Amino acid sequence: MADLKPYIAKAASGEPLSLGDAKAAFDIMMSGQATPSQIGGFLMALRVRGETVPEIAGAVASMRSRMIPVIAPDDAMDIVGTGGDQSGSYNVSSCTAFVVAGAGVPVAKHGNRALSSRSGAADALAALGINIEADADTIGRSISEAGLGFMFAPMHHSAMRHVGPSRVELGTRTIFNLLGPLSNPASVKRQLVGVFAPQWLEPLAHVLKELGSETAWVVYGDGLDEMTTAGTTQVAALENGQIRTFEITPEEVGLRRCSPAELKGGEAAENAKALLGVLEGKDSAYRDIVLLNSGAALVVAGKAENLKDGIAQAVQSIDSGAALAVLQKVIAVSNDKPA
């Protein structure tokens, strides 16, 4: 039986692991050969020392080798946050996904239940009536027929069951918060990824490049793992094989600045109700932050020339009812009913 202890010792001493060592360590954890104490110790050793790009890439390689894939169009994208930002904000990326799909871009959305917050993507979507435990074929059909499919991480990364209890008991972010956005079961090549801390902007952009992404924006919004309308958003953009960094404020793209308190969410049912309100056309700070993120996603998808153009398309997606129609179709298809 393989042993995680040498890798724990290495990480605890402050020594970085090579990509190969990281993959080996994650293979041990993902195959159920490590105890919860060992998993917790290893994850926290990495967290305290600071995870490296090779360690993240090795961990992703381990996860991808075990995942149940989903078939999606070549131009599909993912819109996802790492979680772990401790903000308790609304489910911005989930709402954004419906708006982007309503604008004509297929979305293969990867997400999980809350691990360090009150309501994760899966919690809110389940509260809306989406069957988050649909199988891979049904999700593929949802993407092709409704424009969006939701892939519940534990269904596609069943090996995660070995580390799930340790993550919940730790109650704080770990390397796994970084891995979710990098382990999309539909192997999308375009991503809008939010991170929980600015030091991860460029490293994750480099990891995405290494993993074959064509276009991606990695964003941090002043305390949020999304683009923000309550402050300045920092972006590391992977475009044409190059990575550039820049900042965006809401005012420069014609959106109102709000206070962080206006973006505070609640439990899953409350967040689901607020999400539905945005798709039904209600004006709010939540709508504005969704418009900003949707505009960026449409730029990443190649559907919009710039952020202002993307925001205009997002407004049209909501106000025409297209985004709401996507939600209704996803609910139907995920529950095996005609769209």
Swiss-Prot record:
Listed under GO biological process in this entry are: L-tryptophan biosynthetic process
An example Pfam family from this entry, by short name, is Glycos_trans_3N
Record's InterPro entries? Answer: Anthranilate_Pribosyl_Tfrase (IPR005940), Glycosyl_Trfase_fam3 (IPR000312), Glycosyl_Trfase_fam3_N_dom (IPR017459), Glycosyl_Trfase_fam3_N_dom_sf (IPR036320), Nuc_phospho_transferase (IPR035902)
Q: Does the keyword Amino-acid biosynthesis apply?
A: yes
Binding-site positions, Mg(2+) 2:
D225, E226
The UniProt annotation places anthranilate 1 binding at G81, N112
Q: Where anthranilate 2 is bound, by residue?
A: R167
Needed cofactors, names only, are:
Mg(2+)
State the GO CC annotations. cytosol
Q: In which pathway does it act?
A: Amino-acid biosynthesis; L-tryptophan biosynthesis; L-tryptophan from chorismate: step 2/5
E.C. designation(s): 2.4.2.18
Give the catalysed reaction(s), semicolon-separated.
Answer: N-(5-phospho-beta-D-ribosyl)anthranilate + diphosphate = 5-phospho-alpha-D-ribose 1-diphosphate + anthranilate
Quaternary context: Homodimer.
- What PANTHER family is this protein classified in? ANTHRANILATE PHOSPHORIBOSYLTRANSFERASE
From the Swiss-Prot or TrEMBL record, give the protein name: Anthranilate phosphoribosyltransferase
Q: Which organism is it from?
A: Brucella canis (strain ATCC 23365 / NCTC 10854 / RM-666)
Tell me the classification of the organism that encodes this protein.
Bacteria, Pseudomonadati, Pseudomonadota, Alphaproteobacteria, Hyphomicrobiales
